[in-house]
Amino acid sequence: MPFDANLELHDGTTITGTITPISLTRTSGSVVIDMLALSSTPAKGMGAVLIIGTDLATAGNTIAVTIDHSDTEGSGYVQIANFPTLTKGTGMPGTYITRFNTTLQYVRALITVTGTSYSATNVYILLAYHPFHVL
């Protein structure tokens, strides 16, 4: 994968429910990223890439992903970017890109799911300075 593994907000682990990362330690495939080493984001922002490798398992289920930031690792997160809310049969599999700026230290992807018997596989959420080629 052409992305930096240290900038991986979710690593492809199957999602079976809402995931709210609050730690630098990976749990359920998700993690909080410490942006201090990056000295915040560049002037033109940073890209967040959502890759959904397969469709949702059940009709009526949804997945919504937001990018949040905070000055504190475990709490105080505020939404700074979002991806479209996806449902079975709409836009999956697919790749979505959004951009954001932050001067705060911590960034996470909040994954909110609704429905019953929820399962989403091959989901990656990645950060990148330039997630696409500029010609």
PLM region spans:
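Solvent-exposed serine/threonine-rich low-complexity stretches and specific carbohydrate-binding patches
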Residues: 79-89
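Noncatalytic modules at the cell exterior or secretory-pathway interfaces
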Residues: 46-50, 100-120
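Extended, low-complexity, turn-rich repeat/linker tracts enriched in Gly/Pro/Ser/Thr and Asp/Glu
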Residues: 53-62, 115-119
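Short, surface-exposed beta-strand/strand-loop-strand elements in extracellular ectodomains
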Residues: 59-74
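Short amphipathic, basic-aromatic surface patches that mediate peripheral association
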Residues: 37-38, 48-57
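Exposed aromatic-hydrophobic patches
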Residues: 33-35, 92-101
